[in-house]
C-alpha cells in the first residue's frame, strides 16, 4: 500500500508541476448534493482558515515525514499509510479544470491499465468551482480508492486527494464523500 501512496503522491506532484503556468478558469461548476455523513475527527485548517476539512478518526498529520510548508504539501494519514488525505498547493494554471482532470486520468491510466474511473464531475464548494476525479487504482496487486479534487483557491492551484483501501468500494466511496462533505473553502 506504500507503493500506492507514493504513486498517488507522485501523480499529484506531477499534476501540480505540469499546471504551473497561468490562471484557472472554469465556467462549468455544479453543486454536489452528497448526502454522506461527516466523519467525527480532527478539524484541519490551512491558508489562515481559507481551507478547512475534518479528518476521520485515526488519521493524523504526517507532513513532517512526507511533505512540509516549504513544498506546500500537507499529508494526513493513518498509522498504516493506507488511508490518506494529501493537500497540495501549487501555482495557478491557464488550463481548465476539465483539462487538468483529464490529464490526471491519463497519467493514472498510463501507470495502471486496469484503472476504473468512477466519477469525473464538476462541483462547487462554497462558491469555489472544483473538479472531482474518483477512481480505483491498482499498485503491487492492491487496489485503492482515490478521490482527487482540483481547483483554484487564494491564487493557488489546489489539489486534494483522498486515498482509501478499495477492499469494499462502497465503504471507501462513502468515507471519501464524508471527508469531502466537510470541506470548507473561502476565496
What are these regions (language model features)?
Residues 1-9:
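Bacterial N-terminal signal peptides that target proteins for export
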Residues 28-70:
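N-terminal "mature-domain start" segment
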Residues 105-151:
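Signature of long, low-cysteine stretches enriched in small and polar/charged residues
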Residues 50, 94-99, 166, 170-174:
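Soluble non-cytosolic domains of exported or imported proteins
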Residues 52-97:
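Secretory pathway targeting signatures of secreted, lumenal, and periplasmic proteins
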Residues 16-19:
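C-terminal motif of bacterial Sec signal peptides marking the signal peptidase cleavage site
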Residues 56, 97-105, 147, 173-180:
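Extracytoplasmic/secreted envelope proteins and their assembly/folding machinery
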Residues 59, 158-187:
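Surface-exposed amphipathic alpha-helical segments
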